[in-house]
Amino acid sequence: MTVSRGFAGRRRGGARDDLPPGQYDEGAGWPVLTAEVTPHLDPQHWTMSVDGLVDTPTTWSWDEMHALPQSDYDGPIHCVTTWSKFGIHWSGVSVDVLLDAVGVQDTAKFVLATSTTGYTTNLPLEHLRGGQAWVAWEADGKPLSREHGGPVRLLVPHLYFWKSAKWVTRLTLLDHDVQGFWERNGYHDLGDPWREQRYQGD
């Protein structure tokens, strides 16, 4: 596969102060972009695992995840294809809750997120801690649709949205960086929208 500048978005005037460079406000729309076939997942058969460099590798069922302390996120999301969306109310569990439950080892520095489809994306561990990331299953008070990653997706809103893996099922903590799907194909390893880190070398 080769990486192109595809999925070109449309730009609009009146940019807001909280809009990163090169982005446009999508408004009421919410584009659906994916690198794979959208799966049909039964929430009762879905599980969430956190493993790797942790003291107690743990797998939660759908019901067990919902029994954990929940929290919300209200704020923008930014897609690498140049659209941003404001005003979605997300609900789920902070990744901090999961990390506290498993016990993170001192040597853990990176995370590889894996979806039920086999899609992967890599993140520095520090970008999942401190109230920066969630495992989310609701958007605007409704179950997250499968097109947008439901029943559950990773939500890392301060990075480009390909880092918020749809249909997430596993977080593996590592002492070294392992590139995910898009990163192996030329996308940036971090993906900070305020620094326009879209592609390797940006």
Regions found by a protein language model. Give the residues of each.
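Structured, non-membrane catalytic/scaffold regions adjacent to prosthetic-group chemistry
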Residues: 2-202
